[in-house]
Amino acid sequence: MDLKVFDGQDKSELSMIEVAHAILAHHGKAMAFVDLTNEVQQYLGKSDEEIRERLAQFYTDLNVDGSFISLGDNTWGLRAWYPFESIDEATVGENEEDEEDDRPKKKRRKVNAFLADTDDDDDVIDYDNDDPEDEDLDTDDDADSEDDYDDDTDDFSDDDDDLDDGIEGQLSELHDEEDEDEDDE
């Protein structure tokens, strides 16, 4: 196949997307992805291994590039062939808008965030101290609580000084001979 669009250009510098666009324009009709890929491979002279390595990126590029359109059943065409009004593509959020048009619209109430809703007291924070559960029951008990405990500190003596040093007593200081020589001088 000879594509006049690429006359005088090095085939190794062409992208698969550019070649696919030229092939679709040359044929003038939609093609299956497999057939399109085979023709791109033949035109570029790439090996099966090279095409397999680049196949996922090529498919992604077809989807992302705005000049191609998927017609279903893995068939691809050029978007320029189809008038804008005739294209029936699913877009994000399109179904949601259709569903909203069919449903009757609810009236929305204005909500004042600063007014307490009397029906739903769970969300209201009560800052008043007039509730019996808010009373602090321990106000007078703090002074009496010290008398409830015995002073157990008398049971301990200062005999701890007579005990072995534990691991600290087993440690010895290390001195380098060089340090001792310097100390002697």
From Swiss-Prot:
GO terms for biological process: DNA-templated transcription; regulation of DNA-templated transcription. Residues 90-185 are annotated as: Disordered. It holds the Pfam family HARE-HTH. Residues 117-167, 175-185 have a biased composition (Acidic residues). It comes from the Bacteria. Disulfide bonds: none annotated. GO terms for cellular component: DNA-directed RNA polymerase complex. Residues 14-81 form the HTH HARE-type domain. InterPro entries: Asxl_HARE-HTH (IPR007759), RNAP_delta_N_dom_sf (IPR038087), RpoE (IPR029757). HAMAP family: RNApol_bact_RpoE (MF_00357). Belongs to the RpoE family. RNAP is composed of a core of 2 alpha, a beta and a beta' subunits. The core is associated with a delta subunit and one of several sigma factors. Participates in both the initiation and recycling phases of transcription. In the presence of the delta subunit, RNAP displays an increased specificity of transcription, a decreased affinity for nucleic acids, and an increased efficiency of RNA synthesis because of enhanced recycling. This is Probable DNA-directed RNA polymerase subunit delta. The gene is rpoE.
